[in-house]
């Protein structure tokens, strides 16, 4: 019996010693040497993406190349390709047994054991231990400031079925509404500029009913359109803080245009608790530009976004004249990263990027493990002097979910949409 114990101990020692401890740098130097071997990866890594049974890991978070460099659609650059190659070379994919809904991008991984199955790929029959220390902190609003929130709420529809990303069951639709309402309430906004809301009255009224349960009194403004089975935008405002004046102004004269209800401006007047005007006014332009297609380049959709920006820039002087105020905020989902030409065109037209002013290294969206800003906040020169704080609030993009469906047990506000909201505090004077 003792002899058997000795043999078992020897075999166990051999199996343990067969698992080589290596750094990511050692693996990168010669992947072929470690292929089909069990290894213990010692390099601290961060979760950049979560895809069903796979995690994308890297030494640090990965930026979308167009967030930091001129991309393919704008003429290409050496820096763009350097980032593309760096993101690929410094990231690995591990197939594991983690519960996808428990892993967030930004989680830390401090070593794991797995089999190398090829360059940058690992497989393990166990889970990968992750830790999360970040807090989605939202700065408190400065006394006397007006809080304006720009948010893509990802296809908020009152009706079921039909639209490609609409929730298909009453329970899913109710959970979606509950999450959006919780998220908006938590931000304590005085004015919300919302993208991807079903046009017409149904969806805004549905959201107002949920918001007004808390004792606040909200109302809404949207562009009147005939086709009610599509997405647009709307403003939701606290009636004891701001009130709209004059009619909304679209960047598109054609009411049948897909962008008529997606790109428009509205003037707002500040009021006291009794609803009396305080004399301060400002203008908010809500914009949702043409979406990207998967893959690099996107030249055809890029041209459409440039056209969207041309229409926007032509509309803004009209908005200033209509509302009689040059204090203008531009919010919404621009579907462009920071270094892309549509964004730079807006900046060059005299509307500085407030995210680059307050938090240039942050993000509002994650796609295939790469992060960047698709959601924006620009300000006219007179408004920029009155912007006191801007931040993305990280309650959505880091959380995984299956497209079009939530876990019904998840009653939190997290992942109410796929984009982070942009929170803006202004002190008008």
Task: Tell me the role of every PLM-derived stretch.
Residues 20-36, 96-99, 104-108, 116, ...:
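Metal-dependent phosphoester-hydrolase catalytic domains
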Residues 145-160, 246-248, 281-291:
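Active-site-proximal beta-strand elements of phosphoester/diester hydrolases
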Residues 33, 58-59, 65-66, 120-232, ...:
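N-terminal, active-site-proximal structural segment of metallo-dependent hydrolase catalytic domains
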Residues 202-289:
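Structured beta-strand-rich core segments of catalytic domains in phosphoester-bond hydrolases
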Residues 9-18:
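Hydrophobic h-region of N-terminal signal peptides that target proteins for export
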Residues 18-145, 150-162, 176-178:
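Extended non-catalytic accessory segments flanking core domains
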Residues 55-62, 173, 192, 264-273, ...:
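Extracytoplasmic, non-cytosolic globular domains
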Residues 2-8:
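Sec-dependent signal peptide recognition
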